[in-house]
Structure formats: structure tokens, C-alpha cells
Curated annotation (Swiss-Prot):
Cofactor(s) this protein cannot do without: Mg(2+)
Organism placement in taxonomy: Bacteria, Pseudomonadati, Pseudomonadota, Alphaproteobacteria, Hyphomicrobiales
Pfam families in alphabetical order: dsrm, Ribonucleas_3_3
Biological role stated in the UniProt entry: Digests double-stranded RNA. Involved in the processing of primary rRNA transcript to yield the immediate precursors to the large and small rRNAs (23S and 16S). Processes some mRNAs, and tRNAs when they are encoded in the rRNA operon. Processes pre-crRNA and tracrRNA of type II CRISPR loci if present in the organism.
Predominant place of localization: cytoplasm
Protein name in the entry: Ribonuclease 3
Ranges for domain RNase III: 12-137
HAMAP family (alphabetical): RNase_III (MF_00104)
UniProt subunit comment: Homodimer.
Disulphide linkage map: none
């Protein structure tokens, strides 16, 4: 949905069924689906909700991992957490919910493709989590998150060691050097930044990673290099 109208009663009921929550304040659901490019009478969009939803998701996923992987150390838990709150995972949840049918955007956003459109879908999922939290409380938000993330948490390739640690040990053994990470670009608003990080190991081609934190972007870059060099098996798309 690209026009700035509210959801139809039928669409709202269908989406609420997928979410598992009937909104007491229907406007919250509408706002969670409204991109800043959409012109609405009340001028509301999902940016503030996205800020809150990111924190609610992080808390619930951290608790899920803490309870599920009782022997995992901080490093492994961090790797799993970064995977599960990444833009890729959030966008996959958006696709599972068919949110692209309901997102309200302006004409310019309709032209977006690839990673930029993936980020929009990911942002909407975080906004939706915030709307659920504000409307129903933390337990309702947690129930939604568990519904769509618990299976992913079990499947997540977090059994791998920390990518930066693995890359450092490999580069020391093979080349006698330490990987070098640099931030090439920081973009996006303060509440939702994107970091582009490049990792370099002397003698081989560098790799880049883009994520919502510097640490997560470093992990992405390190993972890509490990997979490219055949140290790690490449993860299937969507996992």
C-alpha cells in the first residue's frame, strides 16, 4: 500500500491476526506502517516508534538468548544477538508478515530497491514492535517477538565463533598480521544510523559490512571475508 490512507477494516483484521494482537488504538498500527515520505493529515510516521521498537526487540532477544543458551559466553551471545536484530532478519520477518502490502510511502520510496528497501521493511518491523508494546505492554510485545524470532534463534548460526576473533587467528596464522577495521561511512539519522566498515588483511582483497552499529558492521565484514576465503561455509540466504 503506497497511498497515505489508513488501513481498511479487512486489511487491519488480517494483519492483527498475523501479529496476534487486536489494537485498542488503531492509529498506532497505522502510524507504525507510515514512512516519513507519506503525506498524512496528522503528519505522523514511524520514526519515533522505530527508535523504541529497536530497544524492545533487543531486550527480548537478549533475554531469549540468555535463557536458551545457558552455557554460551558473552561473545557467542553477542554474535547471535547481532544476527537476530540485524536488518536482514527484521526484513525477513516483514516479508513473512507481507508488510510490503501495508506500508504507506511516498512516490520516491516506491522507487527504492535492494538494501535500501530492505532497510525500510526492517524499520517497519521495529516500529510495529513498538506499537504493540505501547498498545498491549511488554508481555504482548514479547509474545509477538517469540512467535517470529524463537525459531530463528535456534537456527541462527551463532554456534560459530565470534567472526572477528576467528579472522584474527586465521590472519595471524596465514599472514602473520592483524586485521585492520575502518569506518568508511556513517549515514542515517541519529536514532537509526548505518555504519559501513571495511576490514583489510594484508595480501588479500578487503571486505565491507553495513549494519546499525560499528561492532555489528565489523562482524559482517569479518564474516564475509571468512566465507570468501573458505574458512566458514557461506550461510544460506534468509538464515
Amino acid at each position: 500500500m503506497s497511498k497515505a490512507q489508513t488501513l481498511s477494516a479487512a486489511d487491519r483484521a488480517k494483519l492483527e491476526g498475523l501479529i496476534g494482537h487486536d489494537f485498542a488504538e488503531k492509529e498506532r498500527l497505522d502510524r507504525a506502517l507510515t514512512h516519513a515520505s507519506a503525506r498524512t493529515e496528522k503528519g505522523g510516521n514511524y520514526e519515533r516508534l522505530e527508535f523504541l521498537g529497536d530497544r524492545v526487540l533487543g531486550l527480548c532477544i537478549a533475554e531469549l538468548l540468555f535463557r536458551t543458551f545457558g552455557t554460551a559466553g558473552e561473545g557467542e551471545l553477542s554474535v547471535r544477538l547481532n544476527q537476530l536484530v540485524s536488518a536482514e532478519t527484521c526484513a525477513a520477518v516483514a516479508d513473512e508478515l507481507n508488510l510490503h502490502l501495508y506500508i504507506r510511502t511516498g512516490a520516491d520510496v516506491k522507487k527504492l530497491t535492494g538494501k535500501r528497501m530492505m532497510n525500510v521493511r526492517a524499520d517497519v518491523v521495529e516500529s510495529l514492535i513498538a506499537a504493540i508494546y505501547l498498545d498491549g505492554g511488554l508481555e504482548v510485545a514479547r509474545r509477538f517477538i517469540l512467535r517470529y524470532w524463537q525459531g530463528r534463534a535456534v537456527r541462527a548460526d551463532g554456534a560459530k565463533r565470534d567472526a572477528k576473533t576467528e579472522l584474527q587467528e586465521w590472519s595471524h596464522a596465514k599472514f602473520g598480521v592483524t586485521p585492520n577495521y575502518r569506518v568508511d561511512e556513517r549515514s542515517g539519522p541519529d536514532h537509526d544510523p548505518r555504519f559501513k566498515v571495511t576490514v583489510e588483511v594484508a595480501g588479500i582483497k578487503p571486505e565491507t559490512g553495513v549494519e546499525r552499529s560499528k561492532r555489528a558492521a565489523e562482524q559482517v565484514a569479518a564474516t564475509k571475508m571468512l566465507e570468501r576465503e573458505g574458512i566458514w561455509q557461506q550461510s544460506p540466504a534468509g538464515n
